């Protein structure tokens, strides 16, 4: 047995399914998950000594690559001063100044410890501010594992929420309306059915949890208009897209102004950080100034703030996002060319430093139904064959891939060459 296999066997005796987050178990592709010993730049190294070109990037945070010296040094320096104080620090102020400077729609920001905390808190704030209970989310979009968000859609354009996980009471889910991503008609139908009850829309501006599905041109502006028409708040969940699709996020890339923004992943530079913020009048409703309660023992802790501050300063440097776009575009185009040569039907969506690979005969993939129609079994084989080639993709047909500026054009070309060999056997 390999070291990964031995560790996985031991882990399953102690940790549910052997992992601390479900997708890591390789359930979506089968086989034994890799146990990682270290990472540097664009590469992961497993406990068996194998190296992989990494397109998971810790599920998004590693936009600068692994083990970036500026972030590593910032963490070391902060740790020497103490790990957590439970009191305000100068770095929290500097971090808030930087975030609100980089994302101009955020007049104020509050730090939390994860993307789930950010979305959960933003929704509570929207409900408290508007005095309304219902929310709209989209089929196939993921906003963390808060009870009200673990909801799936049934048939039809408008579906009253049904729990997607045991342990979520139906009474919690009934206030969550699920609409179809990239379908404004389904959203209008929800508002017309509940014109005075919907507090907010929460949306991934690029859906990254049904692989990578960008918005149609009219979708995000249409959501803004509907929120304005019916008095609801628009929450853009930039946990995945923030500082990756563009410096000011997908909201800037697509030209839409939210009321609240949720951030995570890159904002922590690899440490557990989330944030939510937006309009000053809305944020003023948070405790202790306002009545909407939110708190966290480790929120804004000095280690995480130091890592995030160092990361964002690097991400804000000229040329970072142009490089991300260039590398991602080259990978997408190369994969499509290699698939066409082998007669493999393929769609590759990409925007900024995100991409998604779909095995499908369709000309495009724009919604959850399109994603579900793709050939998942072929993806599973593709994943394992690419792994054998030393390329680590997301171990699920429903997760986006992530580029970093640490990837070289040689890495990209080697990945395309590996895919060409795999497609020939697929």
From Swiss-Prot:
It comes from the Bacteria. It is found in: Cytoplasm. Its main location: cytoplasm. One of its GO terms (molecular function) is transaminase activity. The keyword Nucleus does not apply. GO terms for cellular component: cytoplasm. CDD domains: OAT_like (cd00610). The modification N6-(pyridoxal phosphate)lysine is found at residue 265. The keyword Isomerase applies. Pathway: Porphyrin-containing compound metabolism; protoporphyrin-IX biosynthesis; 5-aminolevulinate from L-glutamyl-tRNA(Glu): step 2/2. Its EC number is 5.4.3.8. This is Glutamate-1-semialdehyde 2,1-aminomutase. The gene is hemL.
């Amino acid at each position: 047995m390999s070291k990964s296999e031995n560790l996985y066997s031991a882990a399953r005796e102690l940790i549910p399914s052997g992992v601390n987050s479900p997708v890591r178990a390789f359930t979506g592709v089968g086989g034994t998950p890799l146990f990682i010993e270290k990472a540097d730049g664009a590469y992961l190294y497993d406990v068996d000594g194998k190296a992989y070109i990494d397109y998971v990037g810790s599920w998004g945070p590693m936009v600068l690559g692994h083990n970036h010296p500026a972030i590593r040094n910032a963490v070391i320096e902060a740790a020497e001063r103490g790990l957590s104080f439970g009191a305000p620090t100068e770095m929290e102020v500097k971090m808030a100044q930087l975030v609100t400077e980089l994302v101009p729609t955020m007049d104020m920001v509050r730090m939390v410890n994860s993307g789930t905390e950010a979305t959960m808190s933003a929704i509570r704030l929207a409900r408290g501010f508007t005095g309304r209970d219902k929310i709209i989310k989209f089929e196939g979009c993921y906003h963390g594992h808060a009870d009200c968000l673990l909801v799936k859609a049934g048939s039809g354009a408008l579906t009253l929420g049904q729990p997607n996980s045991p342990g979520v009471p139906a009474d919690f889910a009934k206030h969550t309306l699920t609409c179809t991503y990239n379908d404004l008609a389904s959203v209008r139908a929800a508002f017309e059915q509940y014109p005075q009850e919907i507090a907010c829309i929460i949306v991934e501006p690029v859906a990254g949890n049904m692989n990578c599905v960008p918005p149609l041109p009219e979708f995000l502006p249409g959501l803004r208009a509907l929120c304005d028409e019916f008095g609801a708040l628009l929450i853009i969940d930039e946990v995945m897209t923030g500082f990756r699709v563009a410096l000011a996020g997908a909201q800037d890339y697509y030209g839409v102004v939210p009321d609240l923004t949720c951030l995570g992943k890159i904002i922590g530079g690899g440490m557990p950080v989330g944030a939510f913020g937006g309009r000053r009048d809305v944020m003023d409703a948070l405790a202790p100034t306002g009545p909407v309660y939110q708190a966290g023992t480790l929120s804004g802790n000095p280690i995480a703030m130091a890592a995030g501050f160092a990361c964002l300063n690097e991400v804000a440097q000229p040329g970072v996002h142009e490089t991300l776009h260039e590398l991602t575009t080259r990978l997408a185009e190369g994969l499509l060319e290699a698939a066409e040569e082998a007669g493999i039907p393929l769609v590759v969506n990409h925007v900024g430093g995100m991409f998604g690979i779909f095995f499908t005969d369709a000309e495009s993939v724009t919604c959850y139904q399109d994603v579900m129609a793709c050939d998942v079994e072929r993806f599973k084989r593709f994943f394992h064959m690419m792994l054998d080639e030393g390329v680590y993709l997301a171990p699920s047909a429903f997760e986006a891939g992530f580029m970093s500026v640490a990837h070289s054009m040689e890495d990209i070309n080697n990945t395309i060459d590996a895919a060409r060999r795999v497609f020939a056997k697929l």
